[in-house]
């Protein structure tokens, strides 16, 4: 046999080996996913057995004010069809009806809010407030809430940390100043996970928050109290923050809209330990949660303040001419297998745009999305001005992951199990810096090339709807669908798409390139029109 033939045989042998190894890997992955799917089903069966009988329904809503959009309420106050006091009182009454079931609102200012409303009504009645004032204060007289981890002067500001028990804010976060200057009235602050870092809302100071669609289910985190109260009709306007899906996870699980804007347009000052000096590297953002898509842009205009012109929120959008792309499954092996009701949710949206768009939606296959969790972990390690191990002690010392974990599982302590998970995660090695930076840029460039300035991506929200309380401990990576947009700093809107057969919300994410928030919101409005959007978890009369 000649040397040339020998080399050829060796190459063919290597090729066959590579093919065989690839086949084995594919089969092992299929076996893993098949097994994982049925383990997830078993988890639900077991949790359901112990929890389904404990479900408590949300009370019927009898006041039509509760169902109106924040924009509509503001217009009616302006036209004197409603008084601010009537509106605020309606939501105070509703919170008192639903919060005993939800445990969403953890600190209130009802009487002060009603007095704020009466003053507004007096100013409107005597002509002190003019039309120009309404333009500068688009939400005059409309109530809102925000999460307890953001500073609202005079309100609880513990971040769910035991060492901060009883702490109250002495100032307003920058975004709170903006929404107050727009005329909105704060009713209180809502529950969060400890230090905001978990996909369920639970902490040692205020306990766990329940889902209004099924009180035994998760509301998401970290803006879980906001989404729960909003969906139950407890508030018309909600503001959350988002470093890893914290607006969108709760919005998904509670069937409302949530928008994470283009990054670095909204000050972070007053959000937990942040000062506003974190710079452009931070993934932290602030965004609205609403029951009606029409509220997203008006609230966003307020939050971005002087940067409003960068977002083109007043530009008309013809959704038929938007270039649509979609991804059905990000193929991240750490995430639970994608269930059929979630697959059909995104395909319903795709089908709708196939019917109305000038060009059919294109399915994308972008490998980098499967690295979402690893990339987010890397960029979280680069967040400036924060240190989880110190912050969790209120910066009075530094947590010891090993000692505090042992203490938690033996004698208990001041940390939640989710915080212990975060401790253990800190012990794991961070992704390689060179790889993470390169992969982030590669993914960003691929998506920017597809989206341009007139494209959106329809993207999954989760492998399945809201799971039972604490089941997230067995599925700790299921938030990965959300975090990739924090890594890339793209704007993204969580859109409700109705309920599944269990009566739980389903939905999708709508993503655009930076500064194209108006496209996300336009598509959200179209999907709301086509599929109904928010579905109340209570009877109405």
Regions found by a protein language model. Name each.
Residues 72-79, 145, 163-167, 284-291, ...:
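Short, well-ordered beta-strand elements within core beta-sheets of diverse protein domains
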Residues 171-300, 491-498, 504-507:
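Short glycine/serine-rich loop segments
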